[in-house]
Amino acid sequence: MHTLDGKKIVVASHNAGKLREFADLMGPFGFEAKSAKDYGLPEPDETGTTFEENAYIKALAAAKATGLPALSDDSGLCVDALDGAPGVYTANWAETPDGSRDFAMAMQRTEVALQEVGAASAEQRKGRFVAVICLAFPDGAAEYYRGEAEGTLVWPPRGELGFGYDPVFLPNGFDKTFGEMSAEEKHGWKPGQAAALSHRARAFQKFAQARLDLPRLGSA
């Protein structure tokens, strides 16, 4: 197994929301996490058909370009009534003609799709957020950590916190959407103290248990 020498790691993302979450999650472990954008790296084309493949594409590109280990995350919303869509194409559903991303439009598109298949009840609107974290090294070696958060899609959107599809995702057992939760509420844990809540925090918790000597307390 490759070692994480030193405290430098590249977060292979240009997504401001993801970068904030990684900074929150890695802060307690003393890592200096710089983004691919900090290094002036371009965004590679995500040509994979699974979360794992896309996470690897991003992490490997950053690791090779910087000579440092790199962490990437590929994530998406998988809705049961839509046969798992948007899935790995979650970000694509937000793309506009000028190449920017409009997640208000993406949430509306998801709601229209649910209405078209007659998904009206909470039971018919179940889904999950999935996140796969890839730790890649310059020589191509890689490890994967997967986290999922089960919940229900609500409409209209609720809350202005978080990012992406957070305002329409109500995690099981809670009365707040991810869009109504603070970062601490959404992550749902502190190292060694509690179980993670969000998909990204659950994936990161597995990474931390494997790589950062985090005790397996409340593991998901």
From Swiss-Prot:
The active site is at 74 (proton acceptor). One of its GO terms (biological process) is purine nucleoside triphosphate catabolic process. One of its GO terms (cellular component) is cytosol. Mg(2+) binds at residues 45, 74. Its cofactor is Mg(2+). The keyword RNA-binding does not apply. Its EC number is 3.6.1.66. Keywords: Hydrolase, Magnesium, Metal-binding, Nucleotide metabolism, Nucleotide-binding. Gene3D superfamilies: 3.90.950.10. One of its GO terms (molecular function) is ITP diphosphatase activity. It catalyses: XTP + H2O = XMP + diphosphate + H(+); dITP + H2O = dIMP + diphosphate + H(+); ITP + H2O = IMP + diphosphate + H(+). The keyword Metal-binding applies. InterPro entries: dITP/XTP_pyrophosphatase, ITPase-like_fam, RdgB/HAM1. It is an enzyme of class 3 (hydrolase). PANTHER family: INOSINE TRIPHOSPHATE PYROPHOSPHATASE, INOSINE TRIPHOSPHATE PYROPHOSPHATASE/HAM1 PROTEIN. Belongs to the HAM1 NTPase family. Pyrophosphatase that catalyzes the hydrolysis of nucleoside triphosphates to their monophosphate derivatives, with a high preference for the non-canonical purine nucleotides XTP (xanthosine triphosphate), dITP (deoxyinosine triphosphate) and ITP. Seems to function as a house-cleaning enzyme that removes non-canonical purine nucleotides from the nucleotide pool, thus preventing their incorporation into DNA/RNA and avoiding chromosomal lesions. Homodimer. HAMAP family: Non_canon_purine_NTPase. This is dITP/XTP pyrophosphatase.
